[in-house]
Amino acid sequence: MAARLCCQLDPARDVLCLRPVGAESRGRPVSGPLGSLSSSSPSAVPTDHGAHLSLRGLPVCAFSSAGPCALRFTSARRMETTVNAHQILPKILHKRTLGLSTMSTTDLEAYFKDCLFKDWEELGEEIRLKVFVLGGCRHKLVCAPAPCNFFTSA
């Protein structure tokens, strides 16, 4: 069974906040800048890197108290479908890192909540999680699938 996550975009800081459902009372959200290059060293990642969450294909920095280096996971199937009539998620996120106009924060948040995470939770697709890096994360992956090229053309 797939782990359940809360997902919320914070437009004030332009970060994606993630945390396991049920952690509201004890944990802080896992968050990180969209597309920012990481300047922290891999040694800054805590030894408790969240293996208890049973997530596959996530880098250890995803569980760091400082948050992940960048937005970096989705369902393989969803990455290949359109987010709207004209653009796919990697291109949208890449444009956001460049400061270009894309879908609104509200629309992007709705996409994650209603599409990606719903399928992940209800269909148990965690084994299909892939890692897509916006920026230069230096962290190795936990039980990672074969590497993917984030900017592969559609």
Curated annotation (Swiss-Prot):
Modification note: A fraction may be phosphorylated in insect cells and HepG2 cells, a human hepatoblastoma cell line. Phosphorylated in vitro by host protein kinase C or mitogen-activated protein kinase. N-acetylated in insect cells.
Organism (species): Hepatitis B virus genotype D subtype ayw (isolate Japan/JYW796/1988)
Localization, UniProt: Host cytoplasm; Host nucleus; Host mitochondrion
Primary location recorded for the protein, binned into one broad class: host cell
Keyword Membrane found: no
Annotated GO CC locations: host cell mitochondrion; host cell nucleus
Alphabetic keyword roster: Activation of host NF-kappa-B by virus, Activator, Apoptosis, Host cytoplasm, Host G2/M cell cycle arrest by virus, Host mitochondrion, Host nucleus, Host-virus interaction, Modulation of host cell cycle by virus, Transcription, Transcription regulation
Region of interest: Disordered: 26-45
Complexes and interactors: May form homodimer. May interact with host CEBPA, CFLAR, CREB1, DDB1, E4F1, HBXIP, HSPD1/HSP60, NFKBIA, POLR2E and SMAD4. Interacts with host SMC5-SMC6 complex and induces its degradation. Interacts with host TRPC4AP; leading to prevent ubiquitination of TRPC4AP. Interacts with host PLSCR1; this interaction promotes ubiquitination and degradation of HBx and impairs HBx-mediated cell proliferation.
InterPro entries: Transactivation_prot_X
Residue segments, region Mitochondrial targeting sequence: 68-117
Gene responsible for this protein: X
Annotated family: Belongs to the orthohepadnavirus protein X family.
Transmembrane segments: none
Pfam families: X
Purpose of the protein: Multifunctional protein that plays a role in silencing host antiviral defenses and promoting viral transcription. Does not seem to be essential for HBV infection. May be directly involved in development of cirrhosis and liver cancer (hepatocellular carcinoma). Most of cytosolic activities involve modulation of cytosolic calcium. The effect on apoptosis is controversial depending on the cell types in which the studies have been conducted. May induce apoptosis by localizing in mitochondria and causing loss of mitochondrial membrane potential.
Protein name according to UniProt: Protein X
Residue ranges with Low complexity bias: 31-43
Keyword Transcription regulation: yes
Record HAMAP family: HBV_X (MF_04074)
GO biological process, alphabetically ordered: DNA-templated transcription; symbiont-mediated activation of host NF-kappaB cascade; symbiont-mediated arrest of host cell cycle during G2/M transition; viral genome replication
